[in-house]
Amino acid sequence: MNYLPLAPPGMTPPRVLSIAGSDSGGGAGIQADMRTMALLGVHACVAVTAVTVQNTLGVKDIHEVPNDVVAGQIEAVVTDIGVQAAKTGMLASSRIVATVAATWRRLELSVPLVVDPVCASMHGDPLLAPSALDSLRGQLFPLATLLTPNLDEARLLVDIEVVDAESQRAAAKALHALGPQWVLVKGGHLRSSDGSCDLLYDGVSCYQFDAQRLPTGDDHGGGDTLATAIAAALAHGFTVPDAVDFGKRWVTECLRAAYPLGRGHGPVSPLFRLS
């Protein structure tokens, strides 16, 4: 595949801000985001929303970052360094969702924003308070350039169980009605299919992205990696459909390069680009 260009030595690369939680096991969250950004030629900036105590077996505890610290990190980055795109991951609670949305509006940010509505870990551990769903729908989604829910998240957000292409389109349309410019309903969790079909919708047209389903249990951080790769491509100037196409191909290669770690699920790995 064609990679995003790396800036020549001494030249400032595009910057992307990840607003997300920290994963002590290093498989997902801001740790996964920063790995992907570095290998896609962008400078990674972060605003940590929560510190998780987790490993490959699951999430043991979550410690939320205070509102003023979340807002302060975002403001410190964008008012000095500047960013060409941003993405959100784990936001943990309604107060953090509200803080991120209010800060985005107050700073009048207009760069592409990829919202990955993280609700639970791959083990099923909750990463978002149920009360925060309304905050996501009402405050953050209208700011999003692209919303990237998986099938479980789509069900929680719009109460549509995706079981086939028709229900996937219905979920995309219902999610788009909540305000994002584009919606990508990821089909990787649809186990009845031999492949992985993601559906991109802009309110008018649907775009389908198919990929081979890879037989690996080491897929921790796949959703984070996809959203971050899309944000990196947007920072490089890609259109949304082209950024999604790139992100899909990137995460497929990361799945091929995934490695075992600990006693649970290992992470997807962008380190193949170094070989």
Curated annotation (Swiss-Prot):
It comes from the Bacteria. InterPro entries: HMP/HMP-P_kinase_dom (IPR004399), PM/HMP-P_kinase-1 (IPR013749), Ribokinase-like (IPR029056). Its EC number is 2.7.1.49, 2.7.4.7. 4-amino-5-hydroxymethyl-2-methylpyrimidine binds at Q54. Keywords: ATP-binding, Kinase, Nucleotide-binding, Thiamine biosynthesis, Transferase. Pathway: Cofactor biosynthesis; thiamine diphosphate biosynthesis; 4-amino-2-methyl-5-diphosphomethylpyrimidine from 5-amino-1-(5-phospho-D-ribosyl)imidazole: step 2/3; Cofactor biosynthesis; thiamine diphosphate biosynthesis; 4-amino-2-methyl-5-diphosphomethylpyrimidine from 5-amino-1-(5-phospho-D-ribosyl)imidazole: step 3/3. One of its GO terms (cellular component) is cytosol. It catalyses: 4-amino-5-hydroxymethyl-2-methylpyrimidine + ATP = 4-amino-2-methyl-5-(phosphooxymethyl)pyrimidine + ADP + H(+); 4-amino-2-methyl-5-(phosphooxymethyl)pyrimidine + ATP = 4-amino-2-methyl-5-(diphosphooxymethyl)pyrimidine + ADP. The keyword Transferase applies. It holds the Pfam family Phos_pyr_kin. One of its GO terms (biological process) is thiamine biosynthetic process. One of its GO terms (molecular function) is hydroxymethylpyrimidine kinase activity. Was identified as a high-confidence drug target. Catalyzes the phosphorylation of hydroxymethylpyrimidine phosphate (HMP-P) to HMP-PP, and of HMP to HMP-P. NCBIfam families: HMP-P_kinase (TIGR00097). Belongs to the ThiD family. This is Hydroxymethylpyrimidine/phosphomethylpyrimidine kinase. The lineage of its organism: Bacteria, Bacillati, Actinomycetota, Actinomycetes, Mycobacteriales.
